[in-house]
């Protein structure tokens, strides 16, 4: 009888521990205001492309975040000097700083352009897209974007097309891109330190519009 009772207790403990583990590992979903929502709600909102899904505060949490953020940095001059040292470029203190940020290889930035180095047509598509991006920025603010990366993985397709620079002291990441947003992101900083950042994959027109706003 004691043996049967002991076996029964052990089985209960095993089941309890297993249930607790499953509960802890279950993914929980939150909106941009940290309000918990269902998985279906999360996916439906994310599918609109107005918000991005990012890791939450815990390993099994996923959170939605707005794609655009506006703010102000305290010392633009210090950022200028840091970027000039890292890139060997001379920045105009009266013009906006436009930064394209590559976080590292992911399924978003290794998809559409994944094999574009394989033939001249694909290379030309990349060259044309970024050429148009730079032409638009130049028309709006007479400046050029700076290409900054956190992790160089996934940049091979830009060889001979764009020059990328390592994020100096992780400054750009800390100031503007604290999470790994899928694809690439950008930020435009005005002469006064005001900025507009946009998280995740973007169209050229978003960069042009932000540059125009920050050039006032």
Model-derived segments and spans:
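Start-of-domain marker
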Residues: 18-79
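Mid-length scaffold segments of soluble, non-membrane domains
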Residues: 109-110, 118-150
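Bacterial Sec-dependent N-terminal signal peptides
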Residues: 1-27
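Non-catalytic, surface beta->alpha helical segment in thiol-disulfide oxidoreductase systems
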Residues: 194-216
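Thioredoxin-like thiol-disulfide oxidoreductase module
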Residues: 152-182
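Short active-site neighborhood of thiol/selenol oxidoreductases, capturing the structured segment around
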Residues: 86-126
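A short, hydrophobic beta-strand/beta-hairpin element that forms part of a small beta-sheet core
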Residues: 183-198
């Amino acid at each position: 009888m004691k043996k049967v009772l002991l076996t029964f207790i052990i089985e209960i403990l095993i089941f309890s521990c297993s249930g607790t583990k499953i509960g802890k590992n279950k993914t929980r979903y939150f909106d941009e205001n940290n309000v918990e929502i269902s998985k279906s709600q999360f996916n439906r909102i994310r599918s609109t492309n107005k918000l991005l899904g990012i890791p939450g505060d815990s390993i099994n949490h996923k959170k939605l975040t707005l794609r655009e953020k506006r703010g102000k940095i305290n010392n633009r001059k210090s950022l200028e000097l840091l970027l000039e040292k890292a890139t060997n470029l001379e920045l105009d203190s009266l013009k906006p700083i436009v930064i394209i940020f590559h976080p590292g290889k992911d399924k978003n930035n290794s998809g559409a352009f994944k094999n574009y180095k394989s033939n001249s047509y694909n290379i030309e598509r990349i060259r044309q897209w970024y050429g148009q991006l730079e032409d638009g920025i130049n028309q709006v603010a007479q400046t050029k974007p700076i290409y900054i990366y956190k992790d160089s993985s996934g940049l091979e397709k830009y060889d001979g097309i764009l020059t990328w620079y390592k994020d100096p002291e992780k400054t750009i990441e800390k100031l503007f891109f604290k999470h790994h947003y899928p694809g690439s992101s950008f930020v435009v900083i005005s002469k006064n330190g005001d900025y507009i950042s946009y998280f995740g994959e973007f169209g050229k027109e978003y960069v042009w519009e932000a540059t125009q706003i920050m050039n006032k």
